Design a protein with these regions (language model features):
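Short, well-structured N-terminal submotif of metal-dependent ribonuclease cores
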Residues: 1-71
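Low-complexity, serine/threonine/proline-enriched polar segments
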Residues: 64-88
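A generic secondary-structure signal
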Residues: 31-32, 119-122, 145
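Acidic, PIN/NYN-like endoribonuclease modules and their adjacent C-terminal/linker elements
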Residues: 1-5, 10, 22, 43-44, ...
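Active-site neighborhoods of divalent-metal-dependent phosphate/nucleic-acid chemistry enzymes
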Residues: 79-127, 133-137
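Short, conserved catalytic or adaptor-binding loops enriched in Gly and charged residues
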Residues: 32-35, 71-77, 146-152
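A generic local structural motif
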Residues: 27-29, 114-116, 144
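A short acidic, often aromatic-flanked loop/helix-cap motif at beta-alpha or helix-coil junctions
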Residues: 49-51, 87-93, 160-169
């Protein structure tokens, strides 16, 4: 019996950057694919919700177009697995996300980011790849303490640039 594939999560910004052909993001994802070919890339429901919102109501036409391209890429199913539902009650996800904001790991107004982080932890993702400053700025040590209350482990939160800089040879 083989080992369970490593789970990785991408946030909305990652999917938009991939849709736009951002070289740094393409390089990071290619590097991860090369180093971890069996990795299970997950897209959580809150990321899907934000992407759907941006497709219809993004501030600019280019943003709406990028969101549409990102959805088409998701439907191809070549890299990412969209998680339409999670095997957890939504009130539990909300409780974890609320605690993340109450502890000021993420600003109170960034509800979506706290949900992305909570879902990544609940899905047991080892890595959350993002270019979002709020997610990237999370104090990992404090996040560990907060998530341990829920018997969860935090993902490593990294930007595509960090992945390329640290692991490209």
């Amino acid at each position: 019996m083989g080992a369970t594939p490593l789970r990785l999560a991408g946030d909305t910004n990652l999917l938009l950057d991939l849709a736009d052909g951002d070289e740094e993001v393409l390089d990071a994802v290619a590097l991860i694919d090369q180093r971890l070919p069996q990795a299970d890339w997950l897209v959580s429901p809150s990321v899907l919700d934000e992407l759907a919102f941006l497709t219809e109501s993004g501030d600019t036409l280019p943003l709406r177009q990028s969101a549409s391209v990102a959805f088409r890429q998701l439907r191809s199913g070549r890299r990412f697995r969209a998680m339409l539902d999670l095997p957890f009650p939504s009130n539990f996800i909300e409780q974890v996300a609320d605690e993340i904001r109450q502890r000021e790991l993420i600003p109170a107004g960034e509800v979506h980011d706290s949900w992305v982080l909570a879902e990544a932890a609940l899905l047991q993702c080892a890595l959350l790849l993002t270019s979002d400053a709020h997610l990237r700025g999370v104090d990992h040590e404090l996040l560990t303490l907060v998530l341990n209350q829920f018997d969860l482990a935090p993902p490593v939160i990294a930007t595509p640039r960090e992945i390329v800089r640290k692991f490209f040879r």
